Amino acid sequence: METVQLRNPPRRQLKKLDEDSLTKQPEEVFDVLEKLGEGSYGSVYKAIHKETGQIVAIKQVPVESDLQEIIKEISIMQQCDSHHVVKYYGSYFKNTDLWIVMEYCGAGSVSDIIRLRNKTLTEDEIATILQSTLKGLEYLHFMRKIHRDIKAGNILLNTEGHAKLADFGVAGQLTDTMAKRNTVIGTPFWMAPEVIQEIGYNCVADIWSLGITAIEMAEGKPPYADIHPMRAIFMIPTNPPPTFRKPELWSDNFTDFVKQCLVKSPEQRATATQLLQHPFVKSAKGVSILRDLINEAMDVKLKRQESQQREVDQDDEENSEEDEMDSGTMVRAVGDEMGTVRVASTMTDGANTMIEHDDTLPSQLGTMVINAEDEEEEGTMKRRDETMQPAKPSFLEYFEQKEKENQINSFGKSIPGPLQNSSDWKVPQDGDYEFLKSWTVEDLQKRLLALDPMMEQEIEEIRQKYQSKRQPILDAIEAKKRRQQNF
């Protein structure tokens, strides 16, 4: 796929989308080829610019996402003009999505390459990547910008081996009147101590993250990766700076470079400009040293895609045969009380409906998600098929709501003393339910029966409160969409 791109170079270089292109629908300007993966706030797709033939990356972001953060990312990319930072070409509104058109880096992220090859990087490879990354950070920091999420997953390589900084979803701008920021943003294992402690931080917070990234490239994962992220957040500020698991495997120059990055006091930590003069970085070899590992990773990815396609084709054939056998058989849907019927099938619901691209490669050490126990394993998407549920008439909902209200009111009147006091209905703060032992079975049953309608009422109040906050935001977005089609 990439060899075709090299044999057929773009007819001219795309620098920025012109006004004529930006007033068209994005499908008129681009052909979307495939999904590349997930970034902060949206999905990323590979596409081709029809006029020039240039490959680009398009991030599609739902407008329900944090629009302020999306606009911040666009603003930062617009202001940047560096070979070491991913370029921004333009943006579109399409239905409920914002399309952000960016530079395409064909080799993917450094973490993608490590996982595809199932190998960590050599010192020479790390030095070359760090040199380009430091040039990108030097540029950002000169512009008074902090990236705040430096890690191998946010360092992209093009097919020639040039490293570029990407994913500015959490980047921040420093001003003269706000020399240090006080917000905790980033990925836990890569966070600088001062970021976690919220004591204010500046551009050298990125340097700490770069030191952790250097260890990540050398060992395959950052320090503390084997413990819970919340525990790591407490350990990073209190423990001494992390080092290599086996320091004897690495040169003195590399060890010293990491040591210079991982200084706990930000005032004593080296800057990007200073680290570009470090012997480990100054002795870095050219980008040609990265071509072998890039080609190896792309070969692995291509083979996996071909294998997946064969499995899909085989499944399609099997499903086609099953559809022929099952056609015309109608059964009642499980839990369907309104008489709706559906076609019976031996296929399980949702089988083979989502192909997980290997180039997506979700990092196990990525952005922290709390309370994610309900997520399916191996990236499986859990689908809720609302079309199978029978529509409930509005009059039925009205009577059900009235019945719940009557139940709540009647409980307050009919239940005996122990239950009439509203304070008794609250969950005891100390978790002590001993008082229930003195109640009769009838009292307990009435209390149990009252919980469901009370819960429904509380949920409805929360829903209305959420809607009252959400609607003005949606109205503002709609107003902006009507006033302008693009940025």
UniProtKB/Swiss-Prot annotation:
The modification N-acetylmethionine is found at M1. Inhibited by the C-terminal non-catalytic region. Activated by caspase-cleavage. Full activation also requires homodimerization and autophosphorylation of Thr-183. Activated by RASSF1 which acts by preventing its dephosphorylation. One of its GO terms (cellular component) is nucleus. It holds the Pfam family Mst1_SARAH. ATP binds at L36, G37, E38, G39, S40, Y41, G42, S43, V44, K59. Residues 433-480 form the SARAH domain. SMART domains: S_TKc. Its main location: cytoplasm. The modification Phosphoserine is found at S265, S320, S410, S414. Residues 313-326 have a biased composition (Acidic residues). The modification Phosphotyrosine is found at Y433. Residues 303-332 are annotated as: Disordered. Residues 290-310 form a coiled coil. The record marks D326, S327, D349, G350 as: Cleavage. GO terms for biological process: apoptotic process; intracellular signal transduction; protein tetramerization. It is found in: Cytoplasm; Nucleus. Residues 303-312 have a biased composition (Basic and acidic residues). Signal peptide: none annotated. InterPro entries: Kinase-like_dom_sf, Mst1_2_SARAH_domain, p53_tetramer_sf, Prot_kinase_dom, Protein_kinase_ATP_BS, SARAH_dom, STE20/SPS1-PAK. Belongs to the protein kinase superfamily. STE Ser/Thr protein kinase family. STE20 subfamily. This is Serine/threonine-protein kinase 4. It comes from Aotus nancymaae (Ma's night monkey).
